[in-house]
Amino acid sequence: MKTFSAGRTDVGRKRENNEDSFHTDDQVGLYIVADGMGGHRAGEVASSTVVSSVKDYMEAFHTSPVAQETDESNMSPAATAVCHSIELANRVVYQLSQDQGSYKGMGSTAAVAYLHGDTLVTANVGDSRIYLVREDNIEQLTQDHTLFAEHIRKNPNWDPNSASIPMKHILVRAVGIHEAVEADVYEMQPLPGDLVILCSDGLTDMLSDDEIHQAVLAGGELEEVCSRLVDMANEKGGLDNVTAVVFFLQKEEKGLLHKLFGSK
């Protein structure tokens, strides 16, 4: 399968700096979104460090996919490599925060998608999400690592409208905050015509899953889809930096989504 992608990031309507970073590479099949945090531009450093660390590690693996040291989780070499790339990013960001006072306490989310052969590996830390759009459905492939999401998982019958949770956006997991981090890693078999979205919470805090889905189904070039998503988030208030990366998969022959998105 071939992939076609686009990405866009925007500072939003309320922030002075953009602390989001992203990366797309259709040749490698690698897509990354990171949302940094920390004062004095430290968030920008954290997110860009996550992106560069994951990118460098995965490019090396893609060029020469050597066997990866693994535990007993039965992950594929590709999934293990993605996991290791995030662990590397965590060590680099954490060490920077320890070595430079202005970076103390900085951290970042990470959302990574990697297409290796017929397997799509997705991984995340924090609340940057990955969605799968398949035909008429949209599915969140990742779980948010926030106080709010954790409360929902522990209390599945709780009505989120019944009471507010203080600091519900506080992350319970982030890259670079501690010496070690655990990423959620998933593997799936994608289908031709699948479309995948990676995004920061600046998008998902402003738009519902259904609004994101409708923005994708409206079609156009992939660049238009990214811009539509970002513009919609800004129109809703743009309270945070907004980043959207989209890519879709197809066989060599041109199918429905090729016509919808008018890829090259």
Residue ranges of predicted features:
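PP2C/PPM-type serine/threonine phosphatase catalytic domain
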Residues: 1-264
